[in-house]
Amino acid sequence: MEKSLHLEIVTPDKLVLSEQVDYVGAPGFEGEFGVLPSHIPFLSALAIGSLYYKANGKTHHVFVSGGFAEVSDNKVTVLAESAERAEDIDIDRARKAKDRAEQRLAQIKEKVDHARAQAALQRALARMRVRGNA
């Protein structure tokens, strides 16, 4: 049995992470899922939230804003709309985004705008939670 697996997180703009890890936990649409070495292959849609991984006895957190995770051949590949390591998150920017989204939610009448504001609020809150784990 393998002792580690490879985790790769990619966005349309860049490669965010490429490391050997011991465990991956991710926010799936149906709930959080975990992947250990030698896991069976599967594909899952990702929700907005905190992906975390364990490597060398430490837990690391990465904000992901949707996308997909593929598990195959002892590798987890995450294709995310956006992703940021916890230590790279600008907490002031996240707080300002949260405040803007809450203001829009208080004013919005149309459902389309409401959904966009709600998604922006979810992203801001998730970034703040992930940054709190750094």
Curated annotation (Swiss-Prot):
Membrane-topology descriptor: Peripheral membrane protein
Superkingdom assignment: Bacteria
SUPFAM superfamilies reported in the protein's UniProt record: Epsilon subunit of F1F0-ATP synthase C-terminal domain, Epsilon subunit of F1F0-ATP synthase N-terminal domain
Location(s), subcellular: Cell inner membrane
GO molecular function: ATP binding; proton-transporting ATP synthase activity, rotational mechanism
Keywords carried by this UniProt record: ATP synthesis, Cell inner membrane, Cell membrane, CF(1), Hydrogen ion transport, Ion transport, Membrane, Transport
InterPro entries in the cross-refs: ATP_F1_dsu/esu_C_sf, ATP_synth_F1_dsu/esu, ATP_synth_F1_dsu/esu_N, ATP_synth_F1_esu_C, ATPsynth_dsu/esu_N
Main localization (coarse): membrane
GO CC entries: plasma membrane; proton-transporting ATP synthase complex
Biological role stated in the UniProt entry: Produces ATP from ADP in the presence of a proton gradient across the membrane.
Similarity comment: Belongs to the ATPase epsilon chain family.
Assembly and interaction partners: F-type ATPases have 2 components, CF(1) - the catalytic core - and CF(0) - the membrane proton channel. CF(1) has five subunits: alpha(3), beta(3), gamma(1), delta(1), epsilon(1). CF(0) has three main subunits: a, b and c.
UniProt protein name: ATP synthase epsilon chain
Annotated organism of origin: Nitratidesulfovibrio vulgaris (strain ATCC 29579 / DSM 644 / CCUG 34227 / NCIMB 8303 / VKM B-1760 / Hildenborough)
